[in-house]
């Protein structure tokens, strides 16, 4: 009996390991003061599948906490990461004179963003710490104000936060800009027991991070994150300011991924990391913004992007689909239709919906639960196949539930870190797809090859033409 119990426990352990093939190396909460280098560092961290940004808080420094909040929300909204929670320092202490360049810098569309009713930093941090069981890195791109408030007011902060990662000037953290924003908080935090990793900026002797070669290379990277930073350098004001080219807070993003590019010196719980390989750092910046920080697949290294690899009818649309919607949607679409054993419109809708939900929360696969109201009757239920491939939420992982006991609809509820949203295919699109399928079924019948040829043709059309950012209604539930 004892041997049987031990065997059962070992099997459970093995199954647990296989249910999550890999997790991000870093779960982070970021505190920012709204500097231009903060925008670039945050964008790099958003780009990497090896980092999970749980939330972002804002404090005074380069900008007021409230203006920094507006900048952060505009960036997240423009990248379709609306579900990342953002807080601000509602106390409003330690206000400095704002930097005009930081205030002028565009992070995203600021229309409709009001910091007046923004949640307080502490409520954001407390909620995330209670929801996420993995140890967290608290990344400070500005002052120590928020970190100290959290340490003093959130009992689990010191237990759940494994390290403070702090951006510092090239000469070190003492008397640097971030240190001086709130000197009292800086001194108090350096005396507490959570390990400190202080990451210095690139030195003047090492040259600019953003050389002409790097800026040119950024323009060729086909991700929204690289495009965001590339667009910064298309602005005449940005190009005319010397600070634009320095490697400052971006070093935190590089250090988290590639610490070997830095010289690390430790003194007790405080370690300082100094950039040591400028060219390696530039190459790593490109790699991070490409999202090439982990292997995403389990069996194949990469799916071919060469149109010639695919059948003639889809061949002309390959480049356009990848260019418009990204490699993740393309890969998920290919795999979903192979799983589905035919090109299906609702399967592609499921792919697009799953990618959109992951975008919203900025998650990887296997990270949220999904409840589908598409039922188990084709063609609507075909949506579930696309959903599984694009999100990793499968019945085998215990992450997907398909409801058949209610009114069926192209709608799915996603829950992540105690937050829930509902995505629904817009009625006019759902009705058009359903009407087309009914019509060709009525004319040709399911047993006709012509029926499946027309379904295939329509699926390619919808895959190419339907933008996942425009076809779904998103309703926050929790």
Question: For the regions a protein language model found, what residue spans apply to each?
Answer:
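Sec-dependent signal peptide recognition
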Residues: 2-8
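Hydrophobic h-region of N-terminal signal peptides that target proteins for export
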Residues: 9-18
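Hydrophobic alpha-helical membrane context
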Residues: 14-15, 45, 49, 358
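N-terminal acidic, glycine/proline-rich low-complexity segments
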Residues: 20-306, 394-395, 477
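A short N-terminal beta->alpha junction/helix N-cap motif
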Residues: 33, 59-63, 320, 340-345
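Active-site nucleophilic cysteine motif
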Residues: 245-254, 342-352
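Non-transmembrane, aqueous-exposed alpha-helical and coiled segments at domain scale
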Residues: 293-343, 349-478
């Amino acid at each position: 009996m004892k041997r049987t119990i031990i065997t059962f426990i070992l099997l459970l352990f093995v199954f647990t390991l296989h249910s999550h093939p890999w997790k991000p190396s870093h779960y982070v909460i970021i505190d920012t003061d709204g500097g231009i280098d903060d925008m670039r560092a945050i964008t790099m961290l958003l780009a990497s599948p090896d980092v999970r940004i749980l939330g972002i808080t804002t404090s005074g420094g380069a900008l007021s906490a409230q203006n920094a909040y507006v900048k952060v929300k505009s960036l997240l909204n423009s990248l379709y990461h609306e579900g990342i929670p953002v807080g601000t320092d509602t106390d409003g202490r330690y206000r400095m004179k704002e930097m005009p360049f930081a205030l002028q810098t565009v992070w995203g569309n600021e229309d409709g963003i009001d910091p007046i009713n923004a949640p307080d930093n502490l409520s954001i941090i407390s909620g995330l710490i209670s929801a996420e069981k993995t140890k967290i890195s608290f990344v400070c791109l500005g002052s120590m104000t928020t970190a100290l408030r959290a340490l003093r007011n959130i009992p689990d902060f010191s237990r759940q936060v494994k390290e403070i990662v702090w951006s510092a000037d090239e000469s070190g953290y003492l008397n640097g800009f971030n240190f001086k924003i709130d000197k009292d908080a800086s001194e108090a935090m350096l005396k507490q027991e959570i390990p400190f990793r202080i990451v210095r900026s690139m030195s003047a002797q090492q040259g600019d991070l953003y050389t002409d070669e790097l800026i040119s290379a950024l323009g060729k990277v086909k991700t929204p994150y690289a495009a965001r930073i590339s667009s910064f350098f298309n602005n005449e004001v940005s190009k005319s300011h010397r600070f634009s080219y320095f490697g400052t807070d971006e070093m935190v993003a590089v250090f988290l991924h590639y610490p070997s590019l830095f010289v690390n010196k430790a003194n007790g719980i405080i370690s300082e990391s100094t950039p040591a390989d400028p060219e390696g750092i530039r190459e790593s910046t490109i790699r991070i913004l490409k999202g090439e920080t982990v292997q995403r697949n389990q069996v194949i290294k990469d799916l071919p992007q060469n149109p010639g690899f695919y059948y003639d009818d889809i061949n002309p649309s390959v480049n356009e689909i990848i260019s418009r919607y990204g490699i993740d949607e393309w890969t998920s679409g290919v795999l979903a239709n192979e799983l589905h054993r035919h090109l299906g419109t609702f399967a592609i809708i499921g792919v697009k919906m799953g990618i959109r939900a992951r975008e919203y929360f900025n998650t990887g696969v296997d990270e949220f639960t999904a409840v589908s109201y598409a039922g188990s009757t084709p063609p609507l239920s075909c949506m579930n196949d696309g959903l599984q491939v694009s999100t990793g939420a499968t019945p085998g992982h215990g992450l997907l539930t398909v409801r058949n006991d209610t009114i069926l609809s192209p709608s799915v509820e996603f829950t992540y870190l105690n937050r829930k949203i509902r995505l629904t295919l817009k009625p006019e699109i759902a009705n058009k797809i359903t009407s087309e399928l009914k019509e060709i079924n009525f004319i040709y019948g399911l047993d006709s090859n012509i029926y499946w040829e027309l379904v295939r043709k329509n699926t390619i059309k919808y895959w190419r033409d339907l933008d996942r950012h425009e076809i779904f209604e998103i309703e926050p539930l929790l």
